[in-house]
């Protein structure tokens, strides 16, 4: 009897492995990912089955379902909002901008003011001032929140805003902020702040969808001012963590119609997390005196396309003279790697700035496996020396730049909900150029000899680490 049960169990495990392999074949977004999962599920189903159901599913089906329901619940609000936006929409001047609009499913807006916020002190002073000036409502969304000195100051500012009658909606990622105690939010809730986790495993049906995260960092005040970028809430983002030292990051402060794009992304996330449709201001404010054009590009695992990866590839292909990129994690998919190499081969000044110090060791090691190909193609790789580099910024020629939350890795491309602000404006690009030139002055350039001279065991470890790139 016991042997029959064991045999039946083994047969069922292998059958489930075969069924899951077919699912991986039909749903994986890359051929490399499909091959890796199929081989693992058929050969080692005892280990691969739980890994696949926890980490291997490429789309966030719960969010997809919620988007379908939105057709009945939210479409009327979106229609009114888009009608209000018509006077503030610019016709795309080039096919490149048109492609970004198509990926974003949001329009290019005019009459915006985009301002760079460099490093933590300037960013949080700006954010806290925005909280203090809020009159009607506040929308806040972060990946990581800590109950340290900075987190306590944020909480105090929110409590003060709530007491003067401001409606506050606070969304956080339940995995990114898993170390935060419940008492932090309970105090806010007692003051009337509405708080919700963004959890991809919400509900019995979606209990295995643990690998999707909401990596967006957004704040919107009254539908008139918005902030987006790389900063989470914790003292390490002020450069006060002994392990990381000085923290180099970039945020963006935005005024104008583009703010409503940030608001729409938050609004949709809030609806997924809570089921609520919150009442917000959808009337755009135009700042014609500082006419930056802006497209807000949300991306995530519920999209029909790999929006983040396609956006990066489009921006690379649009560069004619210069493409400067900064990212804390640099393990791009094959499409982005090929686009970067081709850009360098056609004479574009391609520079990639990455940290000298590792934050996530597996991701750090993975990069060594393909850096030689990058360097041989003419791409210049720089490592930022003082502290940890966390900014996600791109500069395209003298004409456009992006600031957002997307890292150049598979997690940002396919597993995380992210957001990018694309600003096709020469004056804004000049500001980004000045900022990055200062950063490059604090970097060292990586040589191909440095990579090739690494011991064999380190090369083997890097190649092995790279195999895990689809789920890093």
Give the predicted meaning of each segment.
Residues 191, 349, 353-360, 367-368, ...:
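Cytochrome P450 I-helix active-site segment
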Residues 325-327, 384, 403-404:
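Thr-Gly-centered strand-to-loop micro-motif
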Residues 329-351, 355-360:
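Helical hairpin unit composed of two closely spaced alpha helices linked by a short loop
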Residues 334-337, 364-366, 395-396, 414:
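Histidine/acidic-residue-rich catalytic or RNA/ligand-binding cores of hydrolases
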Residues 322:
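Phosphate-/nucleic-acid-contacting segments
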């Amino acid at each position: 009897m016991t042997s029959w049960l064991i045999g039946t169990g083994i047969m069922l495990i292998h059958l489930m492995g075969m069924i899951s392999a077919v699912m991986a074949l039909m749903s994986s977004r890359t051929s490399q990912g499909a091959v890796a999962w199929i081989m693992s599920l058929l050969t080692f189903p005892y280990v691969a089955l739980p890994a696949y159901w926890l980490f291997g599913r490429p789309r966030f089906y719960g969010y997809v379902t919620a988007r379908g329901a939105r057709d009945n619940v939210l479409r009327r609000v979106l229609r009114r909002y888009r009608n209000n936006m018509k006077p503030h929409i610019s016709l795309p001047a080039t096919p490149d901008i048109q492609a970004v609009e198509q990926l974003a499913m949001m329009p290019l807006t005019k009459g915006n003011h985009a301002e760079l916020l460099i490093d933590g002190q300037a960013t949080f002073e700006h954010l806290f001032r925005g909280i203090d000036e809020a009159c009607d409502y506040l929308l806040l969304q972060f990946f990581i929140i800590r109950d340290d000195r900075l987190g306590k100051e944020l909480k105090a500012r929110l409590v003060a805003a709530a007491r003067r009658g401001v409606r506050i909606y606070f969304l956080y990622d339940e995995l990114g902020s898993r170390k935060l105690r419940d008492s932090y939010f309970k105090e806010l809730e007692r003051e009337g702040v509405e708080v919700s986790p963004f959890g991809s495993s919400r509900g019995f049906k979606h209990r295995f969808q643990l690998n999707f995260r909401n990596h967006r960092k957004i704040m919107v005040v009254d539908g008139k001012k918005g902030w987006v970028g790389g900063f989470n809430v914790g003292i390490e983002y002020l450069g006060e963590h002994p392990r990381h030292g000085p923290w180099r990051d970039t945020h963006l402060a935005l005024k104008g119609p583009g703010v409503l794009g940030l608001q729409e992304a938050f609004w949709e996330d809030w609806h997924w997390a809570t089921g609520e449709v919150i009442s917000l201001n959808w009337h755009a404010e135009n700042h014609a005196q500082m006419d930056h054009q802006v497209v807000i590009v949300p991306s995530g695992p519920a999209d029909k396309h790999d929006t983040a990866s396609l956006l990066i590839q489009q921006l690379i292909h649009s560069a004619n003279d210069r493409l400067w990129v900064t990212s804390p994690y640099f393990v791009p998919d094959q499409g982005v790697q090929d686009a970067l190499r081709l850009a360098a081969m056609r004479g574009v000044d391609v520079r990639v700035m990455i940290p000298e110090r590792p934050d996530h060791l597996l991701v750090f090691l993975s990069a060594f496996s393909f850096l030689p190909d990058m360097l041989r193609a003419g791409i210049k790789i720089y490592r930022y020396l003082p502290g940890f580099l966390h900014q996600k910024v791109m500069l395209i020629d003298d004409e456009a730049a992006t600031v957002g939350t997307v890292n150049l890795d598979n997690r940002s491309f396919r597993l995380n909900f992210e957001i990018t602000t694309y600003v096709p404006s020469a004056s804004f690009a000049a500001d980004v150029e000045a900022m990055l030139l200062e950063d490059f002055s604090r970097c060292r350039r990586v040589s191909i000899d440095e990579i090739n001279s690494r011991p064999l065991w380190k090369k083997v470890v890097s190649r092995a680490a790279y195999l895990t790139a689809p789920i890093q």
